Structures are given as C-alpha cells and as structure tokens.
Amino acid sequence: MEKPDRLQLNEAPWAPFGGKTRGIFRKSLFAVAFPSGFNASLTLAKPGGEFPEHVDSYTHVFYILEGEGEAFVEGQRIPLNSGTALTVLAGKRHGYRNPSPKDLLLITLNIYERP
C-alpha cells in the first residue's frame, strides 16, 4: 500500500515570498507538486507586511485564518479578518497589507487556467 504524502507544517520553515513584497512569508500546503494547475500555501503577513498591487494571469482565493488586514482589488479597499474569503479573478489588479500590530495568517489558493 502506497503511503500518503504528509507534510508537518509546524516543522516547516517560513520562506520569504520575495520580489517586491515586504514582511510576507509562506509554506506550501502540499508535499508534492500538482500538475493540475492548482497550488496552495499558508501565508503569513507580519505587522506592516505588504504584497504590493499587481496583476496575475491566474485566480486567487484568500481565506483569512487569523488577524486583520486590508486588500485592494481594482482600486477598491476590502477589509480582511478571520473568516473572510476573497476571490480575485485573473487579470484584476490586487494586493494586500497588514497595518495591524498582530500577524495576519491566511491560506492562499492559486488556480491556473488549463490550456
């Protein structure tokens, strides 16, 4: 019997997101790569952290687990707090930040269009 892939997230290190982000870190939610056009990560925005506005060719779903922040989608400010789910369609300008004094923890789903 094949063993299921298991990832112990509390033991995995946080990786800086990179690029123009500031104070944003992530951990992959999968132990293996999925060829299906989908990935997910646990994302941490430290106090003052920011993912600058940008446009992607894929859809995001952000689900807030803990903390408070704010997203910007096509110029509209959207408050983020625990329990919020926000979908940003491909091609829409978006970004988010954590202006609060506490960590903002979210699940980020990236859904790529299949050819």
Q: Would you name each region that the model predicts?
A:
Residues 75-90:
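Short acidic-glycine-tyrosine-enriched beta hairpin
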Residues 34, 90-115:
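Ligand-binding loop in jelly-roll beta-barrel domains
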Residues 1-37:
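A short, N-terminal "cap"/entry segment at the start of jelly-roll beta-barrel domains
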Residues 34-38, 46-49, 68, 112-115:
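Short, charged/polar surface micro-motifs in flexible loops or helix N-caps
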Residues 26, 40-56, 90:
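Conserved short histidine dyad/triad with adjacent acidic residue
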Residues 61, 68-70, 77, 93, ...:
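Structural motif
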Residues 44-46, 56-71:
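Short, conserved beta-strand element in jelly-roll/cupin
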Residues 51-53, 71-72, 88, 94-100:
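Short beta-strand His + acidic residue motifs that chelate non-heme Fe in jelly-roll/DSBH
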